[in-house]
Amino acid sequence: MLIREHHENREEWLAARKAGIGASEAAAVIGKSSFMSNMELWRLKTGMAEKKDMTGNSAVEYGNRLEPAMRVMFEACYPEYKLDYHPFDILYQDDCPFIRATLDGELTEIVTGKRGILEIKTAMTSNKMQWERWKDGVPQGYCCQCLHQMIATGWDFVILYAKLTKMDGDCEIRKYQFEREACLEDMEWLKQKSARFWEENVVKGIQPSAILPEL
């Protein structure tokens, strides 16, 4: 059963995030994050370290400024979906409360009633290596994030809506869709990895074997 935790403000929400693995942290569990290692995530979740203050980080601030506009643009371009946004809600399944997600948008397909997730990305591909990550589709770390969100919600699909700023300054909007039925095997694999990390490493306090993060 889907559980929705509502929090009144960012401070409450940040405190509640410590009770599980968030979607943006899912890739770190399996060494597919370009932002943190599984060891860094373990230290965060066991209270050995505090989350880095990203105030002043240009990429984070760029994304925060553009995210509301991306939601408005999505609604204008895809009126077949109803879009809701709850910035301080945390969603999870009652039998798996440590797999948690706060969504950039909650979608309802108007004709079918299917529920889905909007995931917004605003990537500045300022060098060749960053562009290569997007060249053939969605970077693996973001795929993990989308799988994690479907596990947490039990919903039918994720639409990843991305604004990519290229090396020459031009911008490109991309839309990718993940369907639950096509991802069941990968979702189960990720769920097992996340459960093992949480139950064996976080709850019991056993240090995991280090997995080098992707560049």
Language-model segment annotations:
Residues 1-65:
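Charged, glycine-rich intrinsically disordered N-terminal tails and low-complexity linkers that flank
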Residues 2-3, 25-39, 67, 110-112, ...:
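Phosphate-binding glycine-rich loops and adjacent basic patches that engage nucleotide phosphates
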Residues 6, 34-38, 66, 70, ...:
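Alpha-helical structural motif
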Residues 42, 52-85, 142:
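N-terminal accessory/interface modules of nucleic-acid-binding and processing proteins
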Residues 163-165, 208, 212:
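Glycine-rich and polybasic anion-binding loops at the starts of cofactor/ligand-binding domains
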